[in-house]
Amino acid sequence: MATVIDGKNVAASVIQTVKSATAALEKASGVTTGLAVIIVGDDPASHAYVGSKSRMAKECGFKSVQHTLPAETTQEELAGLVATLNADPSIHGILVQLPLPKPLDSEPIIQSILPEKDVDGLSVVNAGKLATGDLKTGLVSCTPAGAMVFVRRTHGEDLSGLNAVVIGRSNLFGKPMAQLLLNANATVTIAHSRTKNLAEVCRNADILVAAVGRPEMVKADWVKPGATVIDVGINRVPAPEKGEGKTRLVGDVAFREVSEIASTITPVPGGVGPMTIAMLMANTVIAAHRAAGQTPPQF
């Protein structure tokens, strides 16, 4: 039976490090870590996400600022707010909650955030820094950064000699995840919907990361015995056993059967999910340390 990684536990330990680093920075240089969150419109799911991010920022000891804008906000108004926050030295991280209501275009807004304040790790500058192996000045997208914490805690810092397969090639997750694994010396294959003999490719992986959004696609016979399996999928499927019209969350991995083969596995829910918000806090305190000329904490 595989060891099941408790994402909530690992996230809590990351948050503990963030709290200590926040307090130490304030003591050493008088700098309070500042996070600004921008939300446009009244989408309930977006407001729930923003609420949890703001609460966590306060819990970490950050100065947390939330800008709630009406749905009819123009592109120019939103760009103006980002420019103001870029120029504010008390703000170290800027987060724009996506998706933005139509007709707003999120891409130019995201790219206008200063790379050193881009705590979501979505700017092309930060993507480029990751691609060139610059983890000293870049910020990494939160979900792959969180998944990588699991990998490091299982295998250590150096993945030399290990084969890693990432299923999924999205800019948000697949590409940065592959890059992080490569930077740690793994031999990396990126697989996707056009990959031939996908099961065979996966069976070669010592570290298998699934991020395609297809419920329970990865079966036991896709997995090398003793592999580490990281499941990033979040899929809602019907759960008639819970009652009519009810659903449950599953990942991209058939958890029960793969648990019999893998040595380590992440569950859904409760695996990678809790790490995303923890790494957002980690990125923010890293950005604050850099701005203050201090050595940032390691996660």
Swiss-Prot record:
Pathway: One-carbon metabolism; tetrahydrofolate interconversion. Keywords: Amino-acid biosynthesis, Histidine biosynthesis, Hydrolase, Methionine biosynthesis, Multifunctional enzyme, NADP, One-carbon metabolism, Oxidoreductase, Purine biosynthesis. GO terms for biological process: L-histidine biosynthetic process; methionine biosynthetic process; purine nucleotide biosynthetic process; tetrahydrofolate interconversion. NADP(+) binds at G168, R169, S170, S193, I234. GO terms for molecular function: methenyltetrahydrofolate cyclohydrolase activity; methylenetetrahydrofolate dehydrogenase (NADP+) activity. Its EC number is 1.5.1.5, 3.5.4.9. Pfam families: THF_DHG_CYH, THF_DHG_CYH_C. It comes from the Bacteria. Catalyzes the oxidation of 5,10-methylenetetrahydrofolate to 5,10-methenyltetrahydrofolate and then the hydrolysis of 5,10-methenyltetrahydrofolate to 10-formyltetrahydrofolate. NCBIfam families: PRK14186.1 (NF010783), PRK14188.1 (NF010785). Belongs to the tetrahydrofolate dehydrogenase/cyclohydrolase family. This is Bifunctional protein FolD 1.
